[in-house]
Structures are given as C-alpha cells and as structure tokens.
Amino acid sequence: MMKYLAAYLLSTMSGNKSPSAKDIEDVLGSVGLDVDMEDANKVVSALSGKSIDEVITAGLAKVSSVPSDAAVSAIAPVVSATPTDALQAGSKKGETKEGPKEESDEDMGFGLFD
C-alpha cells in the first residue's frame, strides 16, 4: 500500500489536486512497478476529499500515540547481570533456550485507512 500512497503524494506534489488510480498507475509504471488497480482504487477512495495536510496531521497524531524505544526503555525494569548469574545460568543443564521471537510490524496500531 505504501507504494500507492507514495505515488498518490507524488501526483499531488506535481499539481494534480485529485489523482486517480490511472495517475497512480502512470507514476508506478514509470519506474517499472506492477500495479494492482484494486489497491490503487482503495488508496484513491480513502484519500478523496482530503487534503494532504489533513492526512499528514492525522498520521502524525497516530504516530505520536505509539511509544518509542526511549519511552519503553524508561519504563522497563533494570536487570543487572553479574558474572555469578552467568555461571549459574550456564550450569543449568537440560534447559533449552528459545531465540528471540520476531515481532510483527503488520499495523502497529496505525490503521492508515481505518
């Protein structure tokens, strides 16, 4: 969806006040990208009647509601690992360690087109 949004913004920046799905297709096609017209139409319908300034302001409000790493680290408890802790952890046999789980960055609570 981001490529369609970027193409929409490029069209508006070039002076087109109301870009269509065809305009998005032209922008993306100029750099050799495939276009799904259903997604292009979804972006156009979601942004029709809205100024780019409104969209940016709404996006900034949503971004500011998501905690950043600095805020999370300030809230997180401080854990101290001493050499004896490492030795005790290393002496436990039969335990398997799980690797870090991958995080999903699917929506992150933004819901751009909600």
UniProtKB/Swiss-Prot annotation:
HAMAP family: Ribosomal_L12_arch
Keywords: Phosphoprotein, Ribonucleoprotein, Ribosomal protein
Positions of region (Disordered): 84-114
Family the UniProt entry places it in: Belongs to the eukaryotic ribosomal protein P1/P2 family.
Listed InterPro entries: P1/P2_N_sf, Ribosomal_P1/P2, Ribosomal_P2
UniProt-recorded Gene Ontology molecular function terms: structural constituent of ribosome
Source species, domain of life: Eukaryota
Protein name as it appears in the record: Large ribosomal subunit protein P2
GO biological process: cytoplasmic translational elongation
